[in-house]
Amino acid sequence: LAMAHLGISRVIELNLDTDQLGDYSEVSLRSKYIDIIRDVQPYLVITFDPDSYLYEDNEDHRKVAVSMAEAMWTSGFDKHPGSASGGVKPFLPVARWYFGREVAKPTHQLDVTSYIDKLTAATSLHRTMLINMARQWWLKGRTAGVSLDEFFQSVNSDVRFFAEMIVRRSREKN
């Protein structure tokens, strides 16, 4: 839903459970990405920054970053068949764009100011993620002896204000 809101017409679903990729084989994930790269033959791949490993606390993001970075060069060699058996048709994307919460060494920044409303609306569509983030804040508040009950209830009923807060906060960092 969020991808369609941004104008992305095709999403390839790997049917992997969120927040559980830490238990998934990096080699198996890389193999899936090799297959996708060879099948789709993208000019550009946009993914998590593998060099921001130390700055990312989400194991899913780290696993995707490393596996995809490896797949983007191994897809060009016949020694890495992916899941295919027999004849392998190597393919390499021309460009790679990385992103992250805190990138190790930024090389480019895009000004998305004119898209901020669209970005906020798309972020709002990630209801489960936003509720999980709010739950983490609520739990930390409870540990610190601070009640965030009203905040958590507000996010549960309508995530839009929280999405806007996150988008605006990320813009302030840059």
What is each model feature region?
Residues 19, 23, 27-174:
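Metal-dependent de-N-acetylase/amidase catalytic core
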